[in-house]
């Protein structure tokens, strides 16, 4: 059993001020690290700023400064914001530290030595005026999708992922002249060559069992569709130099060097860094990331470590979260919309309130919209009327009627039988990084404490049954002490204040939960929080809503907040069709990839690429009807275009089977759409192109041999026959 917890949060990019959504990862890792330390586990929480790459170089140009000066500026801004939010890093460093270059270059040399690096000639935009190759963010132009101005990697308006060559009327961001395409050489990490070792690691029972569902589904879908070689070099100046002849003027792509930053940042601060990073048998690596970073942490970084063929500590526990958004608007400093870290400091709202609200709504399984009205309601009802109220009413009652001294108490077994079983449940939720659920379970205990106080009516019984009333209040005081321990990972300043009421040195250990000794006296009390007022919230909402006037804000405030249910997402975003496999070919570049030639009812050949080697032979699939995600954005796998993705079911024992629509039972028609059972006879729109993450959010499951979403059957649109999963009766669909 592993004895040490190495905790990391995704390294924030250091060319901007972090907003509330950016803070989710560092706050999540902070809560887990605090829990781990309270549990007596040796713990190291590592984070730092990701400083190299195109975004930094271009931002430095805009601010008329050097990349390093820009990083120095924003590093201090990040540090001050994290300090105000009371994020307790053990190490908070930078990827521009003195060890980073050596470690990154050493990883590269090991990968090259072991045969995992390839060289390839490509075409890239080149600016004749500035005499330089242009990385993606150095190119701007018109988005082909929405015609807005966009950078060469992604359109900020419609979120479409782009290559610089996709842009209409591309221009150099520096001189605004039109670039030309020019050949250049780059180095690639040969992910397909590492794939077998990677899959063996992922299939190990001790690996992915500790990953959350979305991360695991996305990783498996990515693997199934085949890994591609990935460029690791760029034509930039700001970055780690490539230690290879002929590549002296190139640097490593930031995605290659950034995850290695966890290691270099640790080495830069502590001497025994190898006891953490080269100790896979003893160290549990727990990583907190956003959904946009999943593949970098489940595929790219592990491949770098595995390919080096050294005993690196590798990912064991992964907690990925969805997006925290703002009032149906985008976080934008320039437009004045959204709360950024420095804004939170000036609102006059304490950091523990911000922490509480972010944890309470941590986007663990779906995106969450920050709403000012919801902030006020959740804080006033759950944090103040529930938790803070229990602390105040119990301690005030004790001091008013029984004095400051806490007498030795008689244990009320009936009281504690309601409470103590819940402690283990909460600690287990912490262990599994289900932080939102842990917080809500703690609040349930607080609510139960209020109910016990109310039901026993101590204000009535204190005269007729003074001893019993004393015992009740004393037991409630120890409950408050326990709640201060459990709430410590979420609201540390408030938890410390509660323990100061008892005059003790801080006792933040899970080992004393449920014990009934150690509190002698109440030294002082005070109100923990003041309620948030509607007027203040209205003013803050207006202030951080950009150019919208108060009327628009009030209208938005009255709109119902509709959570995107999986069945609604499926109906509006996902297009499943039945297709018939007419022909199967092998990719000459990757024998594990099947190229499936499909009949989709349009009399045009359609093809998808899927990694089915080891699962099926060609004979088992040829002529079968299967289901594909028909509106998935096209992709290339080892040079072969794939126009969709087949769907399959997987059970808890990792058994994997393609969903096959039986001719004799279900009477499928090639091209027939798959719909929800309650959408029969409806005129359904054809949804837009989506990425794989959007499909996975539909949460299709196999349940008792039938495919369902939220309990609703999927059926064939024409025959109305249910979609079956005979081989995997119960499992997830990916």
Curated annotation (Swiss-Prot):
InterPro entries: aa-tRNA-synth_I_CS, Anticodon_Met, Met-tRNA-synth_bsu_C, Met-tRNA_ligase_1, Met-tRNA_synth, Methionyl/Leucyl_tRNA_Synth, MetRS_core, MetRS_Zn. This is Methionine--tRNA ligase. It catalyses: tRNA(Met) + L-methionine + ATP = L-methionyl-tRNA(Met) + AMP + diphosphate. One of its GO terms (biological process) is methionyl-tRNA aminoacylation. CDD domains: Anticodon_Ia_Met (cd07957), MetRS_core (cd00814), tRNA_bindingDomain (cd02153). Its cofactor is Zn(2+). A motif ('HIGH' region) lies at residues 12-22. Coiled coil: none annotated. Gene3D superfamilies: HUPs (3.40.50.620), Isoleucyl-tRNA Synthetase, Domain 1 (1.10.730.10), Methionyl-tRNA synthetase, Zn-domain (2.20.28.20), Nucleic acid-binding proteins (2.40.50.140). Keywords: Aminoacyl-tRNA synthetase, ATP-binding, Cytoplasm, Ligase, Metal-binding, Nucleotide-binding, Protein biosynthesis, RNA-binding, tRNA-binding, Zinc. One of its GO terms (molecular function) is tRNA binding. Zn(2+) binds at residues 143, 146, 155, 158. A motif ('KMSKS' region) lies at residues 330-334. Its EC number is 6.1.1.10.
